[in-house]
Protein backbone atom coordinates (compact mmCIF):
# COMPACT_ATOMS: atom_id res chain seq x y z
CA UNK A 1 0.00 0.00 0.00
CA UNK A 2 1.47 3.38 -1.01
CA UNK A 3 2.68 5.72 1.68
CA UNK A 4 1.24 9.25 1.31
CA UNK A 5 2.70 10.68 4.50
CA UNK A 6 4.70 13.94 4.29
CA UNK A 7 8.48 13.57 4.41
CA UNK A 8 10.68 16.69 4.16
CA UNK A 9 13.59 14.72 2.79
CA UNK A 10 11.66 13.67 -0.33
CA UNK A 11 10.75 17.12 -1.66
CA UNK A 12 13.34 19.45 -3.14
CA UNK A 13 12.88 23.26 -3.58
CA UNK A 14 14.82 25.04 -6.35
CA UNK A 15 15.16 28.85 -6.49
CA UNK A 16 16.19 30.30 -9.86
CA UNK A 17 18.11 33.55 -9.89
CA UNK A 18 16.40 35.80 -12.52
CA UNK A 19 19.48 37.97 -12.79
CA UNK A 20 20.63 36.14 -15.91
CA UNK A 21 17.20 35.44 -17.41
CA UNK A 22 15.27 37.99 -19.49
CA UNK A 23 12.01 37.90 -21.35
CA UNK A 24 12.68 37.03 -25.00
CA UNK A 25 10.07 39.51 -26.25
CA UNK A 26 11.63 42.41 -24.34
CA UNK A 27 15.08 41.51 -25.69
CA UNK A 28 13.84 41.63 -29.30
CA UNK A 29 11.87 44.85 -28.71
CA UNK A 30 14.87 46.59 -27.14
CA UNK A 31 17.10 45.53 -30.03
CA UNK A 32 14.62 46.88 -32.59
CA UNK A 33 14.18 50.07 -30.60
CA UNK A 34 17.94 50.69 -30.55
CA UNK A 35 18.13 49.99 -34.28
CA UNK A 36 15.33 52.49 -35.01
CA UNK A 37 17.01 55.13 -32.85
CA UNK A 38 20.28 54.72 -34.73
CA UNK A 39 18.49 54.97 -38.10
CA UNK A 40 16.60 58.05 -36.90
CA UNK A 41 19.83 59.74 -35.82
CA UNK A 42 21.36 59.03 -39.23
CA UNK A 43 18.34 60.58 -40.97
CA UNK A 44 18.48 63.66 -38.75
CA UNK A 45 22.12 64.28 -39.64
CA UNK A 46 21.09 64.89 -43.25
CA UNK A 47 18.66 67.59 -42.05
CA UNK A 48 21.16 69.48 -39.89
CA UNK A 49 21.93 72.11 -42.60
CA UNK A 50 18.24 73.09 -42.59
CA UNK A 51 18.52 74.33 -39.01
CA UNK A 52 19.78 77.65 -40.39
CA UNK A 53 16.41 78.41 -42.05
CA UNK A 54 13.12 79.58 -40.56
CA UNK A 55 9.69 78.48 -41.77
CA UNK A 56 6.16 79.26 -40.62
CA UNK A 57 4.10 76.39 -39.24
CA UNK A 58 1.00 77.91 -40.80
CA UNK A 59 1.70 78.80 -44.47
CA UNK A 60 -0.98 81.48 -44.24
CA UNK A 61 1.23 83.33 -41.74
CA UNK A 62 4.44 82.71 -43.68
CA UNK A 63 6.49 85.18 -45.71
CA UNK A 64 4.66 87.22 -48.30
CA UNK A 65 1.71 89.57 -48.36
CA UNK A 66 -1.92 88.44 -48.13
CA UNK A 67 -4.29 90.09 -50.61
CA UNK A 68 -7.97 89.41 -50.00
CA UNK A 69 -10.54 89.19 -52.79
CA UNK A 70 -14.11 88.84 -51.45
CA UNK A 71 -16.27 86.64 -53.66
CA UNK A 72 -19.71 86.78 -52.07
CA UNK A 73 -21.68 87.20 -48.85
CA UNK A 74 -25.00 85.54 -48.21
CA UNK A 75 -27.17 83.93 -45.55
CA UNK A 76 -27.76 80.16 -45.46
CA UNK A 77 -30.08 78.11 -43.27
CA UNK A 78 -28.53 74.88 -42.00
CA UNK A 79 -30.63 72.12 -40.46
CA UNK A 80 -29.36 70.00 -37.54
CA UNK A 81 -27.24 66.91 -38.26
CA UNK A 82 -26.65 68.06 -41.84
CA UNK A 83 -24.04 70.03 -43.76
CA UNK A 84 -24.83 72.36 -46.63
CA UNK A 85 -22.82 72.95 -49.80
CA UNK A 86 -21.62 76.56 -49.98
CA UNK A 87 -18.66 76.42 -52.38
CA UNK A 88 -18.50 74.33 -55.53
CA UNK A 89 -16.15 75.19 -58.36
CA UNK A 90 -16.46 71.81 -60.02
CA UNK A 91 -20.10 72.20 -60.98
CA UNK A 92 -20.98 74.90 -63.49
CA UNK A 93 -24.21 75.86 -61.74
CA UNK A 94 -22.32 77.60 -58.94
CA UNK A 95 -20.40 79.92 -61.26
CA UNK A 96 -23.44 82.08 -61.95
CA UNK A 97 -24.15 82.46 -58.27
CA UNK A 98 -20.56 83.45 -57.59
CA UNK A 99 -20.12 85.94 -60.40
CA UNK A 100 -23.44 87.72 -59.87
CA UNK A 101 -22.70 88.14 -56.17
CA UNK A 102 -19.12 89.21 -56.73
CA UNK A 103 -18.22 92.04 -54.35
CA UNK A 104 -14.86 93.42 -55.44
CA UNK A 105 -14.63 95.84 -58.36
CA UNK A 106 -10.84 95.95 -58.57
CA UNK A 107 -8.13 93.35 -58.31
CA UNK A 108 -5.79 93.93 -55.33
CA UNK A 109 -2.63 92.63 -57.03
CA UNK A 110 -0.43 94.74 -59.27
CA UNK A 111 1.45 93.54 -62.34
CA UNK A 112 4.88 92.97 -60.83
CA UNK A 113 3.88 90.46 -58.17
CA UNK A 114 3.99 86.68 -58.14
CA UNK A 115 1.33 84.48 -56.55
CA UNK A 116 2.85 81.85 -54.23
CA UNK A 117 -0.37 80.38 -52.85
CA UNK A 118 -4.13 80.86 -52.91
CA UNK A 119 -6.32 80.27 -49.87
CA UNK A 120 -10.08 79.90 -49.84
CA UNK A 121 -11.34 81.55 -46.66
CA UNK A 122 -14.87 81.01 -45.35
CA UNK A 123 -15.96 83.24 -42.48
CA UNK A 124 -19.14 82.25 -40.63
CA UNK A 125 -21.21 84.27 -38.17
CA UNK A 126 -24.56 83.53 -36.51
CA UNK A 127 -27.31 85.99 -37.44
CA UNK A 128 -29.40 85.41 -34.32
CA UNK A 129 -28.22 86.73 -30.95
CA UNK A 130 -27.48 84.58 -27.91
CA UNK A 131 -26.85 81.40 -29.85
CA UNK A 132 -24.36 78.89 -28.43
CA UNK A 133 -23.00 76.39 -30.94
CA UNK A 134 -19.88 75.59 -32.92
CA UNK A 135 -19.42 75.63 -36.67
CA UNK A 136 -18.44 72.50 -38.58
CA UNK A 137 -16.85 72.25 -42.01
CA UNK A 138 -15.66 69.70 -44.55
CA UNK A 139 -13.93 70.21 -47.86
CA UNK A 140 -12.53 68.34 -50.83
CA UNK A 141 -10.19 69.36 -53.65
CA UNK A 142 -11.31 68.05 -57.03
CA UNK A 143 -10.40 68.14 -60.71
CA UNK A 144 -13.47 66.62 -62.37
CA UNK A 145 -15.43 69.45 -64.01
CA UNK A 146 -18.49 67.25 -64.63
CA UNK A 147 -18.90 66.24 -60.99
CA UNK A 148 -22.02 67.73 -59.35
CA UNK A 149 -21.98 67.24 -55.55
CA UNK A 150 -25.02 66.85 -53.32
CA UNK A 151 -26.54 70.04 -51.95
CA UNK A 152 -26.96 68.59 -48.42
CA UNK A 153 -25.05 65.76 -46.73
CA UNK A 154 -25.12 64.15 -43.29
CA UNK A 155 -22.46 65.07 -40.75
CA UNK A 156 -19.67 62.46 -40.94
CA UNK A 157 -16.28 63.18 -39.33
CA UNK A 158 -16.34 66.97 -39.76
CA UNK A 159 -13.75 69.48 -38.57
CA UNK A 160 -14.60 72.11 -35.98
CA UNK A 161 -13.97 75.60 -37.30
CA UNK A 162 -11.21 77.29 -35.33
CA UNK A 163 -10.44 80.82 -34.25
CA UNK A 164 -12.65 83.70 -35.42
CA UNK A 165 -15.06 81.18 -37.00
CA UNK A 166 -12.79 81.13 -40.06
CA UNK A 167 -12.24 78.04 -42.20
CA UNK A 168 -9.14 78.29 -44.37
CA UNK A 169 -8.07 75.95 -47.19
CA UNK A 170 -4.81 76.05 -49.12
CA UNK A 171 -5.48 75.40 -52.80
CA UNK A 172 -1.82 74.95 -53.73
CA UNK A 173 -0.90 71.80 -55.59
CA UNK A 174 1.80 69.50 -54.31
CA UNK A 175 5.23 70.72 -55.24
CA UNK A 176 5.04 74.49 -55.08
CA UNK A 177 3.42 77.76 -55.84
CA UNK A 178 2.19 79.55 -58.87
CA UNK A 179 4.79 81.44 -60.93
CA UNK A 180 2.32 83.79 -62.60
CA UNK A 181 3.23 87.33 -63.63
CA UNK A 182 1.12 90.11 -65.16
CA UNK A 183 -1.99 88.70 -63.52
CA UNK A 184 -3.57 92.14 -63.18
CA UNK A 185 -3.77 92.43 -66.96
CA UNK A 186 -5.28 88.94 -67.19
CA UNK A 187 -7.87 89.86 -64.58
CA UNK A 188 -8.78 93.11 -66.33
CA UNK A 189 -9.39 91.41 -69.68
CA UNK A 190 -11.90 88.81 -68.44
CA UNK A 191 -12.61 87.71 -64.91
CA UNK A 192 -14.05 84.31 -65.87
CA UNK A 193 -11.12 83.46 -68.14
CA UNK A 194 -8.76 84.72 -65.43
CA UNK A 195 -10.19 82.25 -62.91
CA UNK A 196 -10.25 79.36 -65.38
CA UNK A 197 -6.91 79.98 -67.09
CA UNK A 198 -4.84 81.42 -64.26
CA UNK A 199 -6.25 80.13 -60.98
CA UNK A 200 -7.53 76.66 -61.82
CA UNK A 201 -4.61 75.84 -64.09
CA UNK A 202 -2.31 76.18 -61.10
CA UNK A 203 -4.48 75.45 -58.04
CA UNK A 204 -7.08 72.93 -56.90
CA UNK A 205 -10.84 73.46 -57.13
CA UNK A 206 -12.55 73.32 -53.72
CA UNK A 207 -15.86 71.89 -52.56
CA UNK A 208 -16.90 73.10 -49.10
CA UNK A 209 -19.73 72.04 -46.79
CA UNK A 210 -20.62 73.78 -43.53
CA UNK A 211 -22.83 72.87 -40.59
CA UNK A 212 -23.29 73.34 -36.85
CA UNK A 213 -23.45 71.13 -33.78
CA UNK A 214 -26.73 72.78 -32.80
CA UNK A 215 -29.89 70.72 -32.36
CA UNK A 216 -31.96 73.42 -34.10
CA UNK A 217 -31.98 74.97 -37.55
CA UNK A 218 -29.53 77.87 -37.64
CA UNK A 219 -29.19 80.91 -39.87
CA UNK A 220 -25.57 81.63 -40.81
CA UNK A 221 -24.00 84.64 -42.50
CA UNK A 222 -21.25 83.40 -44.82
CA UNK A 223 -18.44 85.41 -46.37
CA UNK A 224 -16.32 83.58 -48.94
CA UNK A 225 -13.09 85.09 -50.23
CA UNK A 226 -9.86 84.19 -51.98
CA UNK A 227 -6.66 85.25 -50.25
CA UNK A 228 -3.63 85.46 -52.52
CA UNK A 229 -0.24 84.93 -50.91
CA UNK A 230 1.92 87.33 -52.93
CA UNK A 231 5.71 87.30 -53.02
CA UNK A 232 7.14 90.62 -51.90
CA UNK A 233 10.12 91.69 -53.97
CA UNK A 234 12.93 93.80 -52.55
CA UNK A 235 12.35 97.52 -53.18
CA UNK A 236 14.54 99.46 -55.55
CA UNK A 237 17.49 101.40 -54.16
CA UNK A 238 16.56 105.02 -53.31
CA UNK A 239 17.87 107.79 -55.51
CA UNK A 240 19.14 109.75 -52.54
CA UNK A 241 20.80 108.72 -49.30
CA UNK A 242 20.45 110.44 -45.97
CA UNK A 243 18.49 110.45 -42.72
CA UNK A 244 15.17 110.87 -44.54
CA UNK A 245 15.63 107.82 -46.76
Swiss-Prot record:
Pfam families given in the database record: Polyhedrin
Entry superkingdom: Viruses
Entry GO terms, CC: viral occlusion body
Sample GO molecular function, one term: structural molecule activity
UniProt KW keywords: Viral occlusion body
Positions of disulphide bridges: none
InterPro entries, A to Z: Polyhedrin
Job description of the protein: Major component of the virus occlusion bodies, which are large proteinaceous structures (polyhedra), that protect the virus from the outside environment for extended periods until they are ingested by insect larvae.
Family: Belongs to the polyhedrin family.
Protein name: Polyhedrin
Phylogenetic placement of the source organism: Viruses, Viruses incertae sedis, Naldaviricetes, Lefavirales, Baculoviridae
Gene that encodes the chain: PH
